[in-house]
Amino acid sequence: DFEHNLLSNNELSKRLGTNFYNIALHTKGGVLLHPGKLVRAMVDVLPKNVCLYENSSLISWNKTKDIISCEFKNGKINTKKIIFATNGFLKSLGIKSNYNFPITLTASMTRPLTDDEFKTIGQPEEWGVLPVRPMGATIRMTKDKRILIRNTAEVHNPFKMKKSDLEIRSINQRIGIKKRFSQLPKDIIQSSWSGVVSRTRNSSQIFEKID
């Protein structure tokens, strides 16, 4: 069991710098992790018997007897065992075609708050808020005084989101920040991006042997 306790509005306001939330469940022992830095760090310590090929889209695959053949734009792999880790795109490989689908999420991060701006919200320590609802808003306060917010989730082609589409969605993030921190300027968002997560009907993971 995780050590945890309920926090009410007053204590939440002190910890988060906003009175937006009425009640929360605090679990101890969590960490805020930068996924990009984690991946880069893992790449740096890969063992010698592991090769990494980036930007190598899988075009097709098939299995003949006990050999799995995978075709790429600039090469081919033949192997007896393989793990397909495709997030929400199992269907594009003809695997479990009716079991999962990709959801596109959009997030934004502010520039570092100035010392004066940070004082207006009580100079809280870094924190992270996860929603009760699966697709509710996720908010972070980082060590370098940035606010990260993800409050959109939609079925959208993740490879065809134009800059104008991203800017429209970042408006939701700007509104979300303003609701929680009305004393901060409106133009503090520095970057926005989108990504994909896999969803299933019963919210469970798909990890099993194909054949």
Predicted feature locations:
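Conserved FAD-binding subdomain of flavin-dependent enzymes
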Residues: D1, D44, K119-T120
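Dinucleotide-binding Rossmann-like beta1-alpha1 core, especially the glycine-rich loop
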Residues: D1-S8
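A structural preference for short, hydrophobic beta-strand core positions in alpha/beta folds
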Residues: L6, L52-E54, I189-S191
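Flexible hinge/switch segments at interdomain interfaces of large molecular machines
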Residues: E11-N19
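Broad structural signal for hydrophobic residues in well-ordered alpha-helices, predominantly aliphatic
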Residues: L12, L46, I177-K178
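Alpha-helical structural context
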Residues: R15, N49, R180-F181
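Helical element adjacent to the flavin cofactor pocket in flavoenzyme catalytic cores
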Residues: N19-K81
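Active-site substrate-recognition segment that forms the wall
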Residues: L58-S60, G75-D116, T120-I210
